[in-house]
Amino acid sequence: MIFQRTVQKMVQTTGVGLHSGNKVTLRIMPAPVNSGIVLTRTDLSPAVSIPAKAELVRETTMCTALVNDAGIRISTIEHLFAALAGLGIDNAVIEVDAPEIPIMDGSASPFVFLLQSAGIKEQAAAKKYIKINKTIRVEDGDKWAELKPFKGFRVNFKIDFNHPEIARSQQHMVMDFSTSAFVKDISRARTFGFMRDIEYLRANNLALGGSMENAVVLDEYRVLNPDGLRYEDEFVKHKILDAFGDLYVAGHAIVGEFCAFKTGHALNNQLVRALLVQQDAWELVSFDKEADVPVSFMVPGTQAFA
């Protein structure tokens, strides 16, 4: 049987909030089987917990945010969730003492390191996967995203930015998911933004924690970061990273192919919601033998370094 996973022990880090610019402390702790990912705001009294569910993603401007019925929010979850998805973590409690997850270096790599430092352990319950049986597609103008049947988890993603630096890079990528491919080829890709947008955001008290320490920054012509890019195709890879995190609010790893053109947080979440309500388009499955599993996660106790 392929088992569910959680972390072996509590692990903690600090960083800054992308939008507030304030210090944020994050803790990741083990959780029981079938509990999923639950986020808790410890800065509130009493503390407020919000389960990671697609219907609670109620804000998708600049990030993915969970918001409960009382309006309490936890923002910028997507990079952490990409790491959880990439390492196959089914159950965890995430504590944060702020309304947003720390941005770290703008990628998922610090969260991958954190989770690997905590250790990953198997639990005494079958791991469940969402197997796509029928194609689900959502559109917004010329943007679109779809999930369709595939034996494995494949991503086919294309971006289209009218910017000379991005246009010079590869804007289309197809990858078959595995933990090692995610850690090596995707996890280090940073969020990116344009100077003209950053100036507007800061004037509106947003992106106060944003800097070249946690984002790729472009002017009208080039990348401004002194060290340049981590990957030649870092832009499309970061959009894939975001999608991994956004799709993980479905609650389980997906067996299928994710195809997308110019999609972002909003359309990714619309796709997950459309999938979950069309119950004949998918089924929950588990696997008895490692050889039968179409999605390859690393073996607990091993390391997959970028």
UniProtKB/Swiss-Prot annotation:
Binding sites annotated in the UniProt record for Zn(2+): H79, H238, D242
Question: Which top EC class is given?
Answer: hydrolase
Sorted UniProt keywords? Hydrolase, Lipid A biosynthesis, Lipid biosynthesis, Lipid metabolism, Metal-binding, Zinc
Lineage, top-rank taxon, reads: Bacteria
Pathway given in the UniProt record: Glycolipid biosynthesis; lipid IV(A) biosynthesis; lipid IV(A) from (3R)-3-hydroxytetradecanoyl-[acyl-carrier-protein] and UDP-N-acetyl-alpha-D-glucosamine: step 2/6
Any Pfam family the entry gives: LpxC
Return the InterPro entries for the record: Ribosomal_Su5_D2-typ_SF, UDP-acyl_GlcNac_deAcase, UDP-acyl_GlcNac_deAcase_C, UDP-acyl_N-AcGlcN_deAcase_N
Which reaction(s) are listed as its catalytic activity?
a UDP-3-O-[(3R)-3-hydroxyacyl]-N-acetyl-alpha-D-glucosamine + H2O = a UDP-3-O-[(3R)-3-hydroxyacyl]-alpha-D-glucosamine + acetate
Give the positions the UniProt entry annotates as the active site: H265
Q: Cite the NCBIfam families for this sequence.
A: lpxC
Similarity comment text for this entry: Belongs to the LpxC family.
Protein name per UniProt = UDP-3-O-acyl-N-acetylglucosamine deacetylase
The species this protein was found in: Shewanella denitrificans (strain OS217 / ATCC BAA-1090 / DSM 15013)
Query: What gene does this protein come from?
Result: lpxC
